[in-house]
């Protein structure tokens, strides 16, 4: 039997899930398969993405986040999941 989905009201400020909202600033690798001069290669920089969502877990190896969820009587289903190696994380800020 398919699960019924509920919409979560954007005006509902309740904290009905036991996960903190966070903003994670991190570094990521980039790659480019095109030809480049040494000057162009020297200008190459790492990507600096920012992710906002709920902190699912964090340990020495990785940080796990999710940006959407569905909660009903059967529990929580997580969506938009991201797993980042902990050494790549530069800053974690708790959001209110």
Language-model features: locations:
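Conserved RNA-binding domains used in RNP assembly and mRNA/RNA metabolism
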Residues: 2-96
